[in-house]
Amino acid sequence: MIRRMALALAILAASLVAHANEPAKAPEPAATAAAPAAATPVLSADALKGQQIAAGVCAACHMPDGNSVIPINPTLAGQGQAYIYKQLSNFKAAENKPAARNSPIMNAMVMPLSDEDMKSVAAWFASQTVKHATPAKDEKLLAAGQKLWRAGNFSKGIPACAGCHGANGAGLPAQYPRLGGQQADYTEAQLKAFRAGDRNNDAEKVMRMIAAKMSDTEIKAVSDYAANLR
């Protein structure tokens, strides 16, 4: 009996020594946690109402989310809410007062909209993400546009566009519009309208005075460059 116990203890001791001499194993890696899904933005009641209005009134020209696919029609997605509201208000004629901004199409489209409707539409488009326009590829023109955007043209008294619209074209929502990613054809048309005086709803005539100093080539260059900004 004693011999059997001694033998069993000897075997156990040998087993423990053998395990002690084995190299340590690295712990099994923990399962990688799945990345949390991106939170869906919560839209205000105004924006939700604006979505419904935009679907029936604006989508044909500007698309339901405001990302225009027609070069001459502006992209409204991501534009400043206050700026969109101002433009819609300017398109609408009041009693005994003509519209501050002229466009046969837009003047007619805003006619049935109330002030609250226009605020809601502005809230909807401002809440959307801009999908940038197809970038221009004329490197020489883009270089000229970049120079104007960043530094202006001192000899002609043209200030840098970035001074008001930002280095990346995001603008200042309550004052200056987003031009980064905007349709180049639309920006070009508006600068020419300011230059000709056909558009005159700019504060203190700032855009009219600047555009009046710009050549067609400069307008084209800066419009193409702005469309490429991200």
Task: Describe the function of each predicted region.
Residues 63-66, 78, 166, 181:
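Periodic glycine anchor positions in long extracellular repeat architectures
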Residues 69-77, 91-135, 173-178, 196-229:
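Axial heme c-ligation environment in periplasmic c-type cytochrome domains
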Residues 79-82, 86-87, 177, 181-183:
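Extracellular/lumenal glycan-associated surfaces
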